[in-house]
């Protein structure tokens, strides 16, 4: 998908072309996210430093301050500042080591670096699609929507995590953030996460951290690192205790290997697999339980379904999926990036920065 762009391509069904035209999309190709290697063979405190050296640390610090100031309640900031050293003992490695290493490098407090990593967990509005084409190939795409696009678009990166010099898994993240909302284990599975807002987020999250529950994006990364196949990944993502509710979308490499997992903090609320033999060749997840109507003021779901049906199963590809994720309002003013991926073709993992000129 390195050549994917927002220009309509020959072969796309005419209805999808009309949807794209109605969205007023530019023909300019959105820029690809920068790609870096992070060696998991390095100690956690040092492994991100080669990446940080490519960035203006004042920009990174300003972005973190903006996110904390807007997304973290003052009582949480005060509380974490008092208990951060105790809380650190409850959090899993390598994440805490990586956070500590980056905040030392940037001369920031451990409390602030931990808070910004938690803040990114709390407000991620997204659209994820997993689908199977008529030949049995599995495709997975996602839009990540978030405020602060003026700075976060400059800090979005694709990271290849290396073990013994080989790519163990790939993910998309923001500089300073150790979790992954989007990722791929080559020739095994792909994962994306969408927020499931159930209220009282900070109160529940902090209490769960002290019970050794894991942040939702950290579990995606741990699953990419540890799970050997699609089935194992689904089991880990469905059952591991979390600090917040979430939707996990998983794609595999074989026919029917696609699922949306609706999570409560303590376990699965629903498992919604592909069922292509009965016509369900795709699943669309935004930020709402799939068995309930999407709210009229945020119905990205219906637009995505219409675009998928306009494309058709026989015409599905990573490029077509990118175009589907470019239909308004699936693609909107808050969209930071679009990633398309297929675990069976891991070299085609591609993230493109959306709205690059928007302030």
Curated annotation (Swiss-Prot):
Optimum pH is 4.5 with N-palmitoylethanolamine as substrate. It is an enzyme of class 3 (hydrolase). GO terms for biological process: fatty acid metabolic process; lipid catabolic process; N-acylethanolamine metabolic process; N-acylphosphatidylethanolamine metabolic process; sphingosine metabolic process. Its EC number is 3.5.1.60, 3.5.1.23. The keyword Glycoprotein applies. It catalyses: an N-(long-chain fatty acyl)ethanolamine + H2O = a long-chain fatty acid + ethanolamine; N-hexadecanoylethanolamine + H2O = ethanolamine + hexadecanoate; N-dodecanoylethanolamine + H2O = dodecanoate + ethanolamine; N-tetradecanoylethanolamine + H2O = tetradecanoate + ethanolamine. It is found in: Lysosome; Membrane. Expressed in numerous tissues, with highest levels in liver and kidney, followed by pancreas. Pathway: Lipid metabolism; fatty acid metabolism. One of its GO terms (cellular component) is cytoplasm. Heterodimer of an alpha and a beta subunit, produced by autocatalytic cleavage. Degrades bioactive fatty acid amides to their corresponding acids, with the following preference: N-palmitoylethanolamine > N-myristoylethanolamine > N-lauroylethanolamine = N-stearoylethanolamine > N-arachidonoylethanolamine > N-oleoylethanolamine. Also exhibits weak hydrolytic activity against the ceramides N-lauroylsphingosine and N-palmitoylsphingosine. This is N-acylethanolamine-hydrolyzing acid amidase. It comes from Homo sapiens (Human).
